[in-house]
Amino acid sequence: MCSSINEGPYNSPTFGKSLSLKVDGGFNAVSINPSGRDIVLASRQGLYIIDLDDPFTPPRWLHHITPWQVADVQWSPHPAKPYWIVSTSNQKAIIWNLAKSSSNAIEFVLHGHSRAITDINFNPQHPDVLATCSVDTYVHAWDMRSPHRPFYSTSSWRSAASQVKWNYKDPNVLASSHGNDIFVWDLRKGSTPLCSLKGHVSSVNSIDFNRFKYSEIMSSSNDGTVKFWDYSKSTTESKRTVTTNFPIWRGRYLPFGEGYCIMPMVGGNNAVYLINLCDDDDSEQNKKTKLQPIYAFKGHSDRVIDFLWRSRHTCDGDYDDREFQLVTWSKDCDLKLWPISDSIYGKVNFDRGKRLEEKLPDYDYCSYNKEPENRENVQKNEFRRLRENFVTTSGLKKNKTNHITWLSGIRMNSATSQEDLFNETKIQNLGEEVSAIGHKFPKVVFEKISVSTRELCLTLNGPWSEENPDDYIFLRISINFPLNYPNKGDPPKFTIEENSNLTMSKRQEILSNLATIGQKYTDSNLYCLEPCIRFVLGEKVSLEDIEEGQEPLLNFDIADHIDFEELSSLDSSYSDSQNPENLSSQSDIESYKEALVFPDTSNQGLDFGRNLALDTTPVPNGCGSCWTATGELFCFFANEKKPEKKQNAIIKLSQKEAGVEKHPFKIEPQVLYDKEVDSSVITAADELKARPKRYVDTLGLGGGTNGDSRTYFDDETSSDDSFDSVADDWDDILRNDIIVRTKIPILRGNFKAFSSVHSESGKTVESTKKNKNLVISKNFSSLLSDRKELALEYLFMDATPEGFARNNALVAEKFDLDEISHCWQILSDMLIDQSDYDPYTTIWNNHPMGIKWFIKEAIVYFERQQNLQMLAMLCCVILSARRKKIPARYYGQELENMEGTIVFNDNESQNTSFWKGSDAFSTRSRSSTVTPNFYGNHLRGKNIHGGDNSSIRSDDHHARLRTHNTLNGSSKFTEPAQKQGSRAISSSPFHSRMPDIKVELLHDDIIEAYEQEDLLHLEVSDIPKFQTYIYQYSKLLFRWGLPLERVKILKVSTDFRSSYSSQGIPPNNNKKSPYNGVLTHWIENNEFGEEKFLARNCNYCDLRVTRSSFICGNCQHVLHSSCARIWWEIGDECPSGCGCNCPEMFDA
């Protein structure tokens, strides 16, 4: 049913020690086995069961994939049901049975709430009873012997329930928090509360009953107070109030002594505070005090989600010998165990060794981390009717947690260690050593990792063939580590599996050398697994360095034995902790200088798995620059300041030519810069030419690197000083860049540090590192024609065209831009509102020197000036002027109930006078069907026959039209075929007593002016170019941080589509916009006269959205649900380009 490695809690290797576990996976709730052996973490992916006595074993994963975050999880506290765990899943509660297989571990599903469950609590006295509370304001009590419905329900009716807790002394009493209030309920009194406690001014986040006094309860709230109540004495005032400077997320009584623990929701240094509850003066009611913690558990880098207590004691003892350990789970994904010292016990008045009134409960000290061997139900209910399984479990994922990755997140330290666990970078245990080795040697396969039993089994390939030394053979090695490893006299024991390719003599040779290496390292209290693996891989290991007190540095040339493609690195957090910049003391820095060790492979062939002569990776940039959208230029350089005193020689470590070397770990410094050589013959070009051109050369690994190459400098030549300093900085940068670039970690437990070269001035590279780079910022915005301040005040919407131009002229004048201001002033004069369809205005607009000419010349001029802002604004203003002047006939609108429609009637007494000195035709308002072009003809005719004697008239002006219609009323007019320079008006009655009359006006200047009027002011062929200007300007606005102005100008640019249609050029609807703008168009009626369905396209894939979709509540842009999942993984702004952060504004 459960596994047990250690005999009891007092053999636990982690109790009383500091432990840190890195567990990624978005876990939001945590609980602990009552025996203190296991921890359960709950998330949307299911449950993780972690064995605290064997944290190096990967967790057991119970899959349960849901979209809802787990609000709470709790392990059954009863010895009768130690395998039960309850967790939330939205409005349901799930009972898990760990004694079953992970694929069939769900025992019950409790469904009685209509909203999400917020808290769960087992009854401390009845193992089958638990309580749940929910956002639906209800509190339910459940009996697992009848789990179909709750046996008790109550509600506050006003506020959602956030917490529910049972009384430790009375199994019929429970309390729940609703908003700012706490209600105490008695199951025997129905849904009427026993009492209500009101005193908080903000939401209550946590409540807890006193373990020893049945009527006392504590509450913690967002108002930053902790209140202690005794509802047997008073329900209106709290017994005591403790104020803090942060909102409190959880607060509970200690399971020992007289005290309590609280943890903040935000702030509070992400710590858990322990406070003494003992108060000599308990008579004073509602006593207010400030927070005075006796101890603070600090170490997390993010908010603490919850804290638990782990305990152990002897079985059937008459004395209280309990020991405790604090367990915390934080949002930084760290599970930490904190030992409790005897001094803390004394501060909370916990008397260990006191005689017990009743014996403590006895729990089976076993772990549920492993899958059960058999699937037999613990309750032996084999006689239940078998249920059909409609869903198979064959497709369930297996527990594929990477063991090496899991080990890399575990760090454990002794409680008596002088080092801080959470700041220490040294190897502390076998698990950390195995994790580091697994990351460094990805070709070494660990078949078995059991840190608890201290057994390893690994496989690798080594050059141990007697027939051909260059051939690699397969080896399987088993390693047993003593309990006190790596103390002196406790070397590991190696066993090599027999292999047909491995002779007995070679096998004995390998075992003998491994035993020698292990003995030498453990005699110096050093971990020996890495040098042993290196030896089996074929590398020569020197033991003399250990005798001389020099600890070998981890070989950076890991590529000697594995391919570059398979090179792995530790997690970023681990790599950061190993960075030489993080050296904590001056002694560490000095040790770098004294014991800088690189393997000298001058005796070995440079075999890196590929030809390094083809590696052209460049060295890091020494300088560079970039422009900003506001016209600022940022430049960075290596610091060229000449040091006060040059060092005599700068040492660079490199590998020599192939050869035989006795000690491969010895240092062989090489002088690159020498003062004694005359530098007068060395030029600056030679200086630069001698620098490395490839990154591999900077590491001293290139096969073509000449070990005798030198670069010289002259202190007396001022022109060479900058090159000297650059050379110094360059060498230091490359040397310190080794760790960052290769990301190969350093095991500080075995090896000394690596630092900069000592200088005669007494300064190290680290001491002057802040001056290594120089960043210069220069503002050249005055040289640019585009101005952000103009964009903030320019107008191009919600006004008349002349108003736009006049405002923009004043804005340009405000910033002393006279040329731009004059252009806007001229344009505003040309756009002044004129009487509609005045013949003089029409002719002037088409004049060769009119507005169209001016706009064309202005655009050409500003194109030469490269003034993108002015080009885009001119296009927007001209387009707004066109929209104002364009008549209805260009939009194809029907005109209904038009006044001025010509009416024909055959009644002489009712004849309409057409031209008898009156100013216009006598008209009658009548509804008639008119084609769009007729309206233009009618307006033209109205001007032609006007009585203005001063107007220009042709001979055709005096032609009288008379037509009689036999029908009483209505006539339908159609426009005949048109020819250039002529117009015809005709009437075609069905039964006319008079012959048809047709009047043509030929070569009329005024009519031609109207007919040929160009209302666009722009060349149609140039419209795509102008649209490009607007689009590029919108991108510039976005880079300036003006998303609203960007959206406005993009909206204006979409009106260019109507410009195409008005000129008789149909837009290409099949062509996608190259600018990803939001294009709008009118929905036309279909052949049945019904409007088409208003469908919207996805802003990601541009396909129609018909089913599940994501609609932003702020910008109203639409995405398919599947497209939204893809986009929000790679982007943080709306895919339409509007600049909205849609996930945050979803329900705006």
Curated annotation (Swiss-Prot):
WD repeats: 63-106, 112-152, 156-195, 199-239, 299-348
S-S bridge residues: none
BP-aspect Gene Ontology terms: cellular response to amino acid starvation; positive regulation of TORC1 signaling; protein transport; regulation of TORC1 signaling
Subcellular location: Vacuole membrane
Residues bearing PTM Phosphoserine: S759
Membrane-protein topology: Peripheral membrane protein
Remaining remarks: Present with 556 molecules/cell in log phase SD medium.
Protein name, per record: Maintenance of telomere capping protein 5
Organism whose genome encodes this protein: Saccharomyces cerevisiae (strain ATCC 204508 / S288c) (Baker's yeast)
Gene: MTC5
